[in-house]
Amino acid sequence: MRIGSIEELQAYFTYSPDRDIVVSGHRGGMMAGYPENCIESCEKTLSLLPTFFEIDFSFTKDSIPVLMHDLTIDRTTTGKGRVSDYTYEELQQFALVDRHRKETPYKIPRLKDMLEWGKDRVVFNFDNKYVNTKGVSDRVRRASIDYYIRQLQPGGDWAEYHNIVLSVRSLDEALRYWNSGIRQVMFCVEISSRADFEAYDASPIPWRYIMAYIRTAVDPRLQEVYDLLHARGVMTMTSIVE
């Protein structure tokens, strides 16, 4: 799936009544033998079905963004400690483990390696864990958003990519990107009420930049909200908990 512009990204995520369901590979997929946030896992998932990938990253001691959901490596690797305790090269001594804690031959990838692998192949949904993780200071939260903005602006490391969706936790966060001139990504935002819908409807962000997240189930009580979103061409996203 080649996405060469924001217009092509928006077209891919435009709702229509006859549109097929698109399955998101959460953290790249979590099959036995395939760890989360791993290029090889994404490759395996993509070989099975058309999809896009929600991924997470944390920063190493030498400030390299690597694919890692947690701020520590304990749960998903054979090592222990915070991601920021190690340089990228030091992290390569550890192996990734699958969801059953089985060791795999795979290593922690850099974000830039994942982006290059996925270029012209798949869409990525970046989930900024620094925004909503407990124990992260307000200063670090702000700094993480500023980092995203710098990377997306002209000359930034992500500026050349047109296959990025940003998960944001609030309208205020979305507006920080929008008011900084970020126009080459879409935003995945929670719209689980009429009030949420009206807040975004009144914002300067056009609906063509929005994908609406509606939590873990389709709720008949929110049918009016779904209809309003669909009338604006907005696709909705929900989570299926295994």
What role is predicted for each listed range?
Residues 1-242:
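Phosphate-group recognition and catalysis centered on beta-loop-alpha active-site segments
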